[in-house]
């Protein structure tokens, strides 16, 4: 596979802000990789972007599963050899149904923190060797 000018991975890129970020990067001519834990939604988002003329690829990626993160980094390394842009977008806000911020059960707080914080760290650490292969690698962290 020939390597495009720039390659970007967007975690949680299958919907919402992640999908729109992928779309806007794709419109700039950047090859986008949709990272999503749900294969069906990730594949559908990738097909949608391809239908818009964007160079898009899908990689299964659950940021809370180290094996998934490692496999995604290996696939991106094999297919592209580098990563120019990492957008850490995957995240969740879960108050546990009717709970308020001051009454959220601790197990929900732990799973939220695992995804929103430790997931970001895991992906960043796994992708750093690929980002270092870029002449001007970038990491963007966002929450919503």
Residue ranges and their predicted role:
Residues 28-44:
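Conserved glycine-rich Rossmann-like NAD(P)H-binding loop of the short-chain dehydrogenase/reductase
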Residues 5-6, 82-83, 131-144:
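Active-site loop of short-chain dehydrogenase/reductase
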Residues 124-125:
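A short, exposed helix-loop element centered on a Lys and neighboring polar residues
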Residues 2-33:
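Canonical Rossmann dinucleotide-binding motif of NAD(H)/NADP(H)-dependent dehydrogenases/reductases
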Residues 89-97:
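Conserved NAD(P)H cofactor-binding loop of Rossmann-fold oxidoreductase domains
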Residues 39-40, 59-74, 120:
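The beta1-alpha1 cofactor-binding region of Rossmann-like NAD(H)/NADP(H)-dependent oxidoreductases
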Residues 71-74, 78, 97-114:
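Active-site Tyr-X3-Lys motif and surrounding loop/helix of classical short-chain dehydrogenase/reductase
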